[in-house]
């Protein structure tokens, strides 16, 4: 095959890859989230949000898969709130919980404010993270492509926006697994300044490759 034909072949493959990215819904969600994180970074440099001051309640946004009648997800967040209240005290906290359907979480998460997060979550996170002092990502399956990339993109978005504005950015008890290349790059790009407290050693090892700072080692029985 001539050099010209090889170059044409490579160009055609590149064009096909770009076209695939353009029509891949997961990729579009990731690209738009990444763009808003970069926009938040620029906004913060030009007009930083007021930082936390001693004596103020710490305003934390808890982002997870809440409001779908997924008992495990709801119980996780309920337990996190209990722990935070125990450690910090109610008078030192102002917690907000993202919920997909407020009607399904009515009566949950005592002392926390519930915020409806739309299915197209990008702008909501862009606006809401700015009004808090930090983000706690609560989803157990935090960085995985097993079912769909959208939920993991939401976790990256919440953490990445907080990190871009020099806020608290913590993934609490998260798990990482097999990720599509585009999701892995998104995690690598936007979660390098976040602290992810992994659920197990396997997740720590996976997150170490894209350079996400590890939290304390998970405890093992015995």
Each predicted region: which residue ranges?
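Active-site-proximal region of nucleotide-activated glycan assembly enzymes
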Residues: 162-218
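Aromatic- and Gly/Pro-rich donor/ligand-binding loops
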Residues: 3-179, 189, 220-222
């Amino acid at each position: 095959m001539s050099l010209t034909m090889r170059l044409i072949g490579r160009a055609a493959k590149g064009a096909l890859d770009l076209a695939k990215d353009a029509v891949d819904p997961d990729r579009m969600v990731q690209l738009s989230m990444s763009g808003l994180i970069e926009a938040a970074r620029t906004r913060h440099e030009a007009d930083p949000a007021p930082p936390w001051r001693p004596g103020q309640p710490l305003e934390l946004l808890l982002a997870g898969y809440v409001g779908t009648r997924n008992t495990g997800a709801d119980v996780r967040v309920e337990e996190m709130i209990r722990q935070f209240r125990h450690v910090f005290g109610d008078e030192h906290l102002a917690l907000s919980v993202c919920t997909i359907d407020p009607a399904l979480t009515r009566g949950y998460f005592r002392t926390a404010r519930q915020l409806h997060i739309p299915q197209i979550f990008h702008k909501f996170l862009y606006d809401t993270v700015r009004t808090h002092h930090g983000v706690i990502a609560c989803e157990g399956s935090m960085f995985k492509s097993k079912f769909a990339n959208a939920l993991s993109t939401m976790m990256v978005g919440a953490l990445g926006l907080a990190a871009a504005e020099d806020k608290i950015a913590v993934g609490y008890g998260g798990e990482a697994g097999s990720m599509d290349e585009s999701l892995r790059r998104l995690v690598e790009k936007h979660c390098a300044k976040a602290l992810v407290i992994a659920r197990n050693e396997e997740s720590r090892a996976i997150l170490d490759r894209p350079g996400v700072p590890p939290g304390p080692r998970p405890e093992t029985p015995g």
